[in-house]
């Protein structure tokens, strides 16, 4: 399933699971009437995660990250060399930003190197992808 082919508005964020090199977001998709797992491998971090009461998604998009226009990546590059292999991950390979905006207009971003979407329960998750 391709992220960009899924209609995300009115979906509900159910769960966020974070591990080394992996973040998984379980989302109830209202259009498909099923739970989906957004698998973020080559996980680098999350910023601005502020969930208090609203978990309904207004918008969700994936963007390639450019160094110069992203504070998160600039800070990451200050801490880690771009060309060193960190357990199969190399920062110079690039990052994606998964930006999720909730109905209260607060958005958060997940930074990783690869994003896949599967039906939740049908996944065979490998954290070393």
Locate the predicted segments by residue.
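Surface-exposed, interaction-prone regions used to assemble/regulate multi-protein complexes
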Residues: 1-129
């Amino acid at each position: 399933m391709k992220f960009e082919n899924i209609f995300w508005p009115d979906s509900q964020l159910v769960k966020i699971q974070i591990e080394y090199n992996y973040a998984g977001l379980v989302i109830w998709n209202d259009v498909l009437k099923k739970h989906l797992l957004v698998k973020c491998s080559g996980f680098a971090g999350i910023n601005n995660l502020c969930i208090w009461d609203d978990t309904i998604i207004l918008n969700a998009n994936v963007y390639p990250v450019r160094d110069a226009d992203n504070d998160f990546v600039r800070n990451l590059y200050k801490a880690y060399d771009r060309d060193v292999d960190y357990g199969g991950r190399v920062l110079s390979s690039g990052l994606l930003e998964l930006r999720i905006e909730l109905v209260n207009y607060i958005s958060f971003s997940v930074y990783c190197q690869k994003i896949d979407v599967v039906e939740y329960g049908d996944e065979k998750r490998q954290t070393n992808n």
